[in-house]
Amino acid sequence: MASNAARVVATAKDFDKVGLGIIGYYLQLYAVELILSEEDRSQEMTALATELLDTIEAFKKEIGGESEAEDSDKSLHVMNTLIHDQEKAKIYMLNFTMSLYNEKLKQLKDGPWDVMLKRSLWCCIDLFSCILHLWKENISETSTNSLQKRIKYCKIYLSKLAKGEIGSSDEKTLDYADFADDSEEIKDEDVDHQTSDLENNNNDKVEGLAPKDQTTSYEPVDEVPEFIDDADSVNEEEQTVDKNEDAITKDEQQVVKKEVDLTRPSAPSEPAAAEHKSYTKDELTKIMDRASKIEQIQKLAKYAISALNYEDLPTAKDELTKALDLLNSI
């Protein structure tokens, strides 16, 4: 779980760097909930969650304040809308993630089969998992199954890439036709329908932010892009997921080690979109406030012990009094 959260944080920072702060915003929210759902989280991860909450609040205030200015850019108004309108935010995240996923399917066929392809597939896994977690109450069962299926496909592709089964001149290359499913429509009809309804029923459309690719910003995507599904020989492929877990784990460790040095990666677990409890903003604040107070109490106790070592009784008494006051406030 810790390695998953660390990877999500690294991905969020990448999106911030390329001007897609709203994607990073929701990935950070997802990372906080991943960390808080871990009962045995380390102090480092607790501190990371606190830092993320501060970053999230600062981003909301910055966007909210700038969007209210008379000469503010239209994109700021859009981002402010995406922060406060969860239905529009869900559609935007779905639209972006499916665009990225579809682009990576084409790259799996044509190449290059480089480290960025692997990183992008992990990015798709994190984005799909984020959507399932943050909006699980507002996503149909059909869409949920569809997104979970694509997470499995991404893991299968990562395993094949790690073992050299895709893009290697000495091994069997990917036959793109193997993953075309004639039984399904090319487009994801459920999400396409949601997007159309949203645009028809709201005068203030969500536009101007959906990128054509991961590195460009503020280009509109009018509809969910064409989606090439991958379901021929699904049973055979899905049975290989568990067998290929070691190869996937090794690949993830290489990616996380390059991106962030927060914790040692462990074998990735299945995205827990429906397993984690969702917290309200007030609940998150209370949890982090309690953790912060406990950490402060520990520091004050250390100061008191240090003062006692030097027989500085007044300072020791003062520090212990502060610690006791904080303890009583919990």
Curated annotation (Swiss-Prot):
It is a peripheral membrane protein. The modification Phosphoserine is found at S183, S233. GO terms for cellular component: endosome; ESCRT IV complex; multivesicular body. Residues 190-207, 240-262 have a biased composition (Basic and acidic residues). Residues 37-68 are annotated as: Interaction with VSP60. Changing L327E: Abolishes dimerization. Residues 1-167 are annotated as: Interaction with DID2. It is found in: Cytoplasm; Endosome membrane. GO terms for molecular function: ATPase activator activity; protein-macromolecule adaptor activity. Changing K322A: No effect on interaction with VSP4. It comes from the Eukaryota. Disulfide bonds: none annotated. The modification Phosphothreonine is found at T195. GO terms for biological process: late endosome to vacuole transport; late endosome to vacuole transport via multivesicular body sorting pathway; lipid transport; protein transport. This is Vacuolar protein sorting-associated protein VTA1.
